[in-house]
Amino acid sequence: MKEVSQQKKELVNEITQRIKASRSVAIVDTAGIRTRQIQDIRGKNRGKINLKVIKKTLLFKALENLGDEKLSKLKENSGGQIALLTSDLEPTEIYKIIESTFQKTAPRGGEIAPEDIVIQPMTTGFPPGPMMTEFQKVGLQTGVEKGKIAIKKETVFVKKGETIPKDKAKILEMLEIKPLEVGLQLLGLYSEGVVYSKEVLSLTPERIANDMAAAFSQAKAIAKSSMFFVDEVLRDLLAEAKIKADALALAGQFITEDNVKDFLVRANVNAIILNNVLNKGSTQETPEEKKEEAKKEEKSPDESISEGLGALFQ
């Protein structure tokens, strides 16, 4: 017990010294991250950050030893599986590194499915045997193709929001299906007397500009709807008022210098329409004319011939 206690003291002292020597200190959540991924993160960022997985009690003890109230605030949001990240980089650079640690991975079992996990028809590469029973147990329709186990039908394996059972997690790993994305989650960062949250560090110039533009548009819309006269909306309000006034003048037959052309155009259009209607009416045959035309058509061929001969001697 004394040996274990001594090891803990040495570890706390090591952490304390590491924090003292670093410009920036962060606590990150490592839940769901496997040892291999931690090693990959260390390898890719060697010389930029130092990452050490540690028990909360030992880390909190080291923070207490430093006696810095602001630094001790890092304990407030620290829970679950955590690691200490130290660096001499700027807080924003550290945050970029943390965000870049996310990778696709297969579940272990017990995780919540972020989306529907769908298994498509495929040849698995496994020979027929006990494995076929394992696939069938979890609801997969299987067969044999070219001497290998094949999944015959598309299957919604786990629905969004459901807990992924261990037996299904095992199958997903065997099929190399990686529905989860895991990485370091920033819980808090301390640098040069200032404590930063994830929400603050996630702000980018582009996001700030977009948020400001959206806020300006919303404020402008409210000012216009409430008729609040400020420089930013005055031009729009005047333009809308003119459009409404012009429409009202036209509807009320009120002629002004601004709308006289509109009245002339309207009068011209109406004249054209009236002229077309009158011309159409004048070309229509009366009932008497139609009857006379019908009588002419009813004459026999002999009558037509005699009338023609008679006309020659008139």
Swiss-Prot record:
Q: Where, by residue number, does the polypeptide cross the bilayer?
A: none
UniProt keyword terms in alphabetical order: Ribonucleoprotein, Ribosomal protein, RNA-binding, rRNA-binding
Coiled-coil zones: none
State if Zinc is listed as a keyword.
Answer: no
Q: Which InterPro entries match?
A: Ribosomal_protein_uL10, Ribosomal_uL10, Ribosomal_uL10-like_insert, Ribosomal_uL10-like_insert_sf, Ribosomal_uL10-like_sf, Ribosomal_uL10_arc
Q: Which domain of life is it from?
A: Archaea
Gene Ontology CC entries for this record: cytosolic large ribosomal subunit
The Gene Ontology biological process annotation of the record reads: cytoplasmic translation; ribosomal large subunit assembly
Which GO terms of the molecular function aspect are on file?
large ribosomal subunit rRNA binding; structural constituent of ribosome
UniProt lists compositionally biased (Basic and acidic residues) regions at: 287-302
Q: A single Pfam family, by name?
A: Ribosomal_L10
Region annotation (Disordered) ranges:
281-314
Q: Does the keyword Coiled coil apply?
A: no
Q: What does this protein do?
A: Forms part of the ribosomal stalk, playing a central role in the interaction of the ribosome with GTP-bound translation factors.
Quaternary assembly = Part of the 50S ribosomal subunit. Forms part of the ribosomal stalk which helps the ribosome interact with GTP-bound translation factors. Forms a heptameric L10(L12)2(L12)2(L12)2 complex, where L10 forms an elongated spine to which the L12 dimers bind in a sequential fashion.
Family that this chain belongs to: Belongs to the universal ribosomal protein uL10 family.
State the name under which the record lists this protein: Large ribosomal subunit protein uL10
Task: Tell me what gene encodes this.
Answer: rpl10
